[in-house]
Structures are given as structure tokens and as C-alpha cells.
Regions:
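Gly-rich Lys/Arg/Thr-decorated short loops/hinges at beta-loop-alpha junctions or inter-strand turns
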Residues: 15-17, 42, 81-89, 157-161
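A conserved beta-strand/loop capping segment in the N-terminal third of enzymes
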Residues: 49-87, 221-222
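Residues forming the flavin
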Residues: 1-33, 73, 94-230
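N-terminal beta-alpha lobe that positions the nucleotide/phosphoryl donor
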Residues: 43, 56-59, 104
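Charge-dense, low-complexity intrinsically disordered segments
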Residues: 42-45, 49, 92-96, 168
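Glycine-rich active-site loop/strand segments that organize a redox cofactor
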Residues: 21-51
Length: 230
């Protein structure tokens, strides 16, 4: 596993609000409609169905791995609500859910003898022959270059928020993987769709903006422009 910075400097660590799950069989249609409506009905329906249907298994797996979600007084999982959801479906850990999930999983990955985490290592190209990917070219912090050969390559490079002056993303999340994929004619889709988190703490200081959770809007907060208009 290669990461451009420290393994804990990923946008997943910054997620605050929580993670959604299906609340029961009778919740499926509402959950599906909420998701489609939030995506202006341009969503891939198969992907939406898979996300909803697999959510309970994923949560059970996270609980098995000791992710600590908040519980109600009766000991059952507690739920909050986020924007576009018609009912509370969000499991959370204080306001640092992303850190709780990702750090728990990362700690377990570090115990695996068959997984090596290479921090401060940047992928600069794909090793390709006859249109077949055979690994990557990586560069460390001292500009040393290493060919890393592999039968399988997964590009999990996040978004492009680091390209913007104002962003809740880390600055190194800059779309490198997309650029390299384009160079090698890897099929990409919907690059014109950029998700911008709408609420941050205003500051004149340069750098990453402090994220204000979606849960704030889900619990009833409203967004207004500088003229007081919604």
C-alpha cells in the first residue's frame, strides 16, 4: 500500500458525521428514494441497491473489528440524521467517525505480515506493456524512484479537493491517479461531477478548511447566502 503522506493523513480521517445503514426491510424503499433524489436521479441504480443492501453486513463487520459507534441508553446503536435522509440512519462516533473507523482498520492492517504500508511514497506512473498494467513507478520523499511490479493495481486516490484554494481536503489529495489513468487511456466516468462539501468554518488563513459536519444540516440547520437567502 502506497500513500503520499502519513497513512493517517487521508480524507477518510476527516469525516465527521457518520456512516449510513439500512434500518430494516421496511426502510429500503425510502432509503433508495432518498439516495436517488439526492443524486437528481442520475445515480446508477445497481450501485445504489448494492450500497443499501450491503450496509448491514459492513456495519456488522466494523463492529466485529471493534469500531466504537455511539449507543443509546438501552445499549442499542444510536442514530442521527444527515441531509437528504428522511429518517435517522447515521451511525457515529462523537464527531470523529471517520477517524474512529479508519484508525481502527489501519491499526489492524499494520498487524498483517502480508501487508506493507509505504508512507511518503508517490505513484508517478503505471508500468504498462501491451495495454496491460504490471505495477507502478513510485517516488519517495528524496526523489528516489522505484518500480513496483504487481499482478493487480488498485487506484484508491480520493478526489481532487487539494487543487482548490478553499477545500476541506488535504492538499496532497490532488487527482494524481486520475491524471495517470487518463495518460494510459483507462476508462473514466463522470469527471465533470465534483462533490463539494458545502459547510466549512470560514477563515482568511490559507490551507485546508475545517469541515462542519453534514449532520448539522441533517438535524435541521439551514444554509443561507450572504444576502440571507436560502
Amino acid at each position: 500500500m502506497l500513500t503520499k503522506q502519513g497513512a493517517d493523513l487521508s480524507d477518510s480521517f476527516l469525516a465527521q458525521g457518520g456512516i449510513c445503514m439500512l434500518r430494516g426491510v421496511d426502510d429500503y424503499e425510502d432509503y433508495f428514494e432518498d439516495t436517488m433524489r439526492a443524486g437528481h436521479y442520475e445515480n446508477n441504480k445497481r450501485a445504489v441497491n448494492l450500497m443499501i443492501r450491503s450496509s448491514n453486513d459492513i456495519i456488522r463487520d466494523l463492529l466485529w473489528r471493534n469500531v466504537d459507534f455511539v449507543r443509546a441508553e438501552d445499549g442499542e446503536l444510536a442514530f442521527t440524521r444527515e441531509g437528504a435522509h428522511s429518517r435517522p440512519r447515521i451511525l457515529f462516533h462523537e464527531d470523529i467517525t471517520g477517524k474512529e473507523i479508519t484508525q481502527t482498520l489501519l491499526d489492524q492492517v499494520k498487524t498483517k505480515e502480508n501487508i506493507e504500508i509505504c508512507e511518503y511514497m508517490t505513484m508517478v506512473d503505471i508500468i504498462s506493456k501491451d495495454n496491460i498494467c504490471g505495477g507502478v513507478i513510485a517516488m519517495d520523499a528524496k526523489n528516489n524512484v522505484y518500480p513496483i511490479r504487481s499482478q493487480f493495481v488498485v487506484l484508491a486516490c480520493g478526489g481532487i479537493g487539494g487543487l482548490f484554494q478553499n477545500s476541506t481536503n488535504y492538499p496532497h489529495i490532488a487527482g494524481d491517479g486520475l491524471g495517470i489513468a487518463m495518460k494510459h487511456q483507462v476508462k473514466l466516468e463522470h469527471l465533470d461531477y465534483i462533490q463539494i462539501h458545502p459547510t466549512t468554518l470560514f477563515s482568511h488563513k490559507p490551507g485546508r478548511r475545517f469541515l462542519i459536519s453534514e449532520s448539522v444540516r441533517g438535524e435541521g440547520a439551514l444554509l443561507y447566502d450572504k444576502n440571507g437567502q436560502r
